[in-house]
Amino acid sequence: VLERGKDVTNRMKDVEHFWESGELNPESNVQFGEGGAGTFSDGKLNTLVKDKFGRNRFVLETFVEHGAPEEILYENKPHIGTDLLRNVVAGIREEIRSLGGDVRFEAKVTDFVIQDGKLTGLIINDKEEIKTETAILAPGHSARDTFKVLSDRDLEMNPKAFAIGLRVEHPREMIDHSQYGKGA
């Protein structure tokens, strides 16, 4: 696992520094670092009720195995909480390592080595090359620099469907009149 940001503990220090001073570390902040943007959410989980393949259940069970409360397996609107979520994320990292995986922080993929139309390596931080024929990218939506490199290399990308919501606020009197008529 190559993570452009820092581990969750050091990332928290960078985020707190930003909140206190306004000084942004562009590689370790609310968007980038171990756990992604969700690490600084309030830990509400999307249950994906229409998840016919059961992937969400697997994710929730994995969270429970790493310290999340069992209630998230059956609650309608499961919630972990920010502080506990950070511990869960760190626990998952340690399991990856215990199973022989390598997790590297401050390891930004800055280029892709392509030979004869095939991936042969990744360039990390503009200097180190890691030989590989396969890479699974999970850059999140804020890694525009990564998307630019993919585009510059003419590597195929497929957009993910998304939905945008909005909130409209109305005066209470207007809502009451709409719901209950003139007698409201």
Regions found by a protein language model. Name each.
Residues 1-40, 44, 48-61, 66-184:
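Residues forming the flavin
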